[in-house]
A protein has these predicted regions:
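N-terminal cap/leader regions of alpha/beta-hydrolase-fold enzymes
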Residues: 1-244
Length: 244
């Protein structure tokens, strides 16, 4: 596991490389449940398409990968909810200013990996990681692809709401929202689409019918295989269009 020095400590990170050993870079923002084997599996799948994937522990201020790892059985609704009570506050600790600073460090680290070929990069985020991905794309003109799946909190009334970053983005965007998600309602998705249109950005912005929040995570009770396959097929197409 790679270690990334930051202004506030050290973030551990997974690096997954393609069969060729080199390729365009993709920054992977984990969900609220931490940098665990499921995240490594997903990063490896993206890498198998021909990309170098960097997945940092974005909660490094709260502890190491081991410190913030899931406790209990996430595959039951009760276990998932119990760990959410532990993991949820960490999201609040990672405010917009900290996220912006971290993102710049992560993108610099990604580009400096010897396996990463010169050129545009992509970002992808899950759950609250989608917020980080949008912020990264809004601040870095060389981010050519940005995807977010079962995102939460992309559209708020706050001045630092992630969707306000879209005005300065250059990327193509892909969003696969969860269905019946209180953290990303149909009204939120509509407002996100309006912000994408106002910025003149190419985008796919969809609600995946019947897919719960967390649907990509096979180690949790929210797993929905059909929605995951749809999300990753769309992600594969996005990266192929924008990074090659």
């Amino acid at each position: 596991m790679l270690t990334i020095p930051t202004a506030d400590g050290v973030a551990e990170a997974i690096v997954a490389t393609p069969p060729s050993g080199h390729g365009p870079g993709v920054l992977f923002f984990m969900d609220a449940f931490g940098l665990r084997p499921r995240i490594a599996e997903m990063a490896a799948e993206i890498a198998s398409w021909g990309y170098v994937v960097l997945a940092p522990n974005v909660f490094y201020r709260d502890g190491s990968v081991a410190d913030v790892a899931p406790r209990g059985d996430l595959s039951t609704p009760e276990g998932r909810e119990a760990f959410w009570q532990v993991a949820g506050p960490r999201i609040g600790h990672l405010n917009a200013d900290l996220a912006v600073a971290d993102n710049a460090t992560y993108l610099e680290t990604l580009r400096e990996l010897p396996e990463v070929t010169p050129g545009p990069v992509g970002v992808v985020g899950f759950c609250m990681g989608a917020r980080l991905a949008v912020r990264a794309a809004g601040r870095d003109p060389d981010v050519a692809a940005c995807a977010g799946f079962h995102a939460g909190g992309l559209v708020t009334e706050a001045q630092d709401s992630p969707h306000r970053e879209l005005a300065t983005a250059r990327a193509e965007f892909l969003f696969g929202h969860a269905d019946n998600d209180g953290s990303m309602t149909p009204e939120n998705a509509k407002a996100l689409g309006e912000a994408l249109d106002a910025a003149g950005l190419a985008a796919t912005n969809e609600i995946y019918e019947g897919a719960p929040h967390g649907y990509t995570m096979s180690d949790t009770a929210a797993w929905n295989e059909a929605a995951f396959l749809r999300a990753f097929a769309n992600l594969k197409d996005l990266l192929a269009r924008t990074l090659h």
